[in-house]
A protein has these predicted regions:
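Short, solvent-exposed loop/linker segments at the N-terminal edge
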Residues: 265-271, 371-381
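Beta-strand-rich structural segments
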Residues: 275-279, 379-396, 443-447
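Low-complexity "stalk/linker" and mucin-like segments enriched in Ser/Thr/Pro/Ala/Gly
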Residues: 301-316, 365, 370, 408-427
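Edge beta-strands of extracellular beta-sandwich domains
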Residues: 346-356, 455-467
Length: 505
């Protein structure tokens, strides 16, 4: 959908970030939609609002003036949002003259000349910034150099460490389709970067991870895979790592919070021997094979390090040992892993995992974020089809293709030409975007495997409703096609009287 994100998804994205434990968002490299700012106000997220621009400067004087005009308009639009913590009134990663930087700073003061104004932030290495700006962008360690700035230091983009800017190979970037091990490497890489920011002096105040969501980009053939969510907002292991950094005592009226444990392990024939657990509890107890073996380890909360270090249980998983229960003893139910989070000696949260067996059925869920789908013709939600075994365990190694169909007041965004429908299963799931029509009503989503059969996973259905739009539509609908054209189009878009996605028979 590109930049055509409806207001509901702006809110859902802000909540997803709050769920992950984020408390500050840098809206690079341009201001976000006003609905995103409203969501940040509601959810308690600080925002750094950046003026549009990235890695380009034009010596024509009019270019700088146009940037300054953008900055004034940006501040006037967002200055009454309580979520705004900083303005970024300069161009990202761009070399510009001193007078431009000073004028940009003056504009932030002119447009909000009151006590407690949002501060201005810019790169410490750019002209005039270290000497004049309120906050400087830098890195952990800049606060301990001899020429360190006097202002607070903030890292505008942390987590990236590419081998070079041509190949873009990087251990913090992992597609969900690559599976368990790359996702774990990504999570631990980001944990290391996050940890580095705590090994600093009080001059260093934090940073923003680049970037929370996988996305397409114009300057490189690969999508950006460094998100803690994929492009369809499915969580990766890195999401759980960041969520584990929030205090177990935190309470929030809208966001996910509280004690948590997460096992970053799928118990497959290819899984690592070590089991990594993310938790914000005092300690973690790991049991396998119905408690046949049990270990307990503390969650390290060391001063000068990230709040809750990942817990690693060494040499726990052995596929051949698990096979002795399922194959030799015919007791596959005993092959399980239970992780318990303990605070003050009491178990406060639990997660149970089992290896997925054969793929037998599909399961659908809608990622609504507790926000209704609005019948305005542009709102949409993500519906996810998971391939599971008989017991509901997601089959992470499944390689199916899922065909989606919709009945009622909804449509599928995309078709076979872009791999949207049918959709290949990645890491056990296949997402699809369901868009509302302009009429409120029931929507039924059906999912089946592309190649059906008696041994193939069974189909699934999910039904939900859209709600009426808040405001009436301001347009007049007219039919301009002739009767012959309308008849031809209807025939092209139906098979046996049913609507079908393009490219699917």
């Amino acid at each position: 959908v590109g930049n055509a994100l409806p207001n509901s998804q702006q809110w859902r994205d802000a909540k997803r970030l709050r769920d992950a434990g984020c408390t500050i968002i840098r809206t690079a490299h341009y201001p976000q939609d006003p609905s995103f700012m409203d969501a940040c106000d509601e959810l308690g997220l600080f925002v750094i609002v950046a003026t549009p621009g990235w890695q380009y400067w034009n010596k024509d004087l009019q270019f700088g003036e146009l940037v300054h005009r953008n900055t004034r308009e940006m501040i006037r639009r967002d200055r009454n949002h309580p979520s705004v913590l900083m303005w970024e009134p300069i161009l990202n990663e761009t070399r510009y003259p001193l007078d431009f930087a000073l004028k940009a700073l003056d504009i932030t003061k002119e447009e909000y000349p009151y006590p407690g104004r949002p501060v201005a932030a810019a790169d410490v290495h750019s002209a005039g910034v270290k000497e004049h700006y309120d906050v400087v962008y830098g890195w952990p360690g800049d606060d301990e150099k001899e020429d360190r700035p006097e202002q607070c230091i903030f890292t505008r983009e942390f987590g990236e460490n590419v081998d070079d800017w041509y190949a873009h190979n990087n251990d913090n970037r992992a597609s969900r389709s690559w599976g368990e091990h790359p996702l774990l490497v990504q999570a631990l890489s980001l944990a290391k970067s996050y940890d580095e920011m705590y090994r600093t002096t009080g001059l260093f105040i934090g940073g923003a991870q680049w970037h929370p969501f996988d996305h397409q980009r114009g300057y490189h053939p690969d999508p950006y895979w460094g998100g803690i969510y994929d492009a369809f907002r499915q969580k990766k292991y890195a999401y759980e790592m960041f969520r584990s950094q929030s205090s177990a005592s935190l309470r929030h009226p809208l966001a996910e919070c509280g004690p948590m444990v997460f096992v970053a392990h799928e118990m497959s024939q290819f899984s690592d021997k070590d089991v990594v657990v993310f938790s914000n509890c005092d300690s973690v107890r790991l049991s396998v094979y119905d408690g046949t073996k049990t270990w307990t380890k503390p969650v390290v909360h060391a001063k000068g390090h990230l709040p809750n270090a990942p817990v690693v249980f060494e040499n726990v998983w052995d596929f051949w040992e698990a096979r002795s229960y399922s194959y030799t003893q015919k007791n596959w139910q005993k092959v399980n892993m239970i992780v318990e989070g303990i605070i003050n000696g009491k178990v406060v949260c639990t997660q149970k995992k089992m290896p997925s067996r054969r793929s037998t059925k599909l399961r659908l869920y809608a990622d609504t974020g507790n926000v209704n789908l609005v019948a305005d013709g542009s709102d949409f939600i993500v519906v996810v089809a998971e391939v599971t075994d008989d017991n509901g365990n997601v089959r992470r190694l499944a390689k199916e293709n899922i065909v989606f169909t919709v009945e009622g007041e909804g449509d599928i965004i995309g078709d076979a030409t872009i791999g949207a429908n049918p959709r290949a299963v990645e890491f056990g799931s296949a997402p699809v975007l369901i868009r509302s029509t302009r009429k409120a009503g029931k929507i039924k989503v059906k999912a089946r495997v592309l190649f059906e059969g008696t041994q193939a996973p069974t189909a699934a259905e999910l039904e939900f409703e859209s709600v009426p739009a808040e405001f009436p539509f301001c347009y007049e609908e007219r039919e301009i096609a002739s009767a012959a054209v309308r008849t031809r189009l209807q025939k092209e878009n139906t098979v046996d009287g049913r609507r079908t996605p393009k490219g699917v028979g």
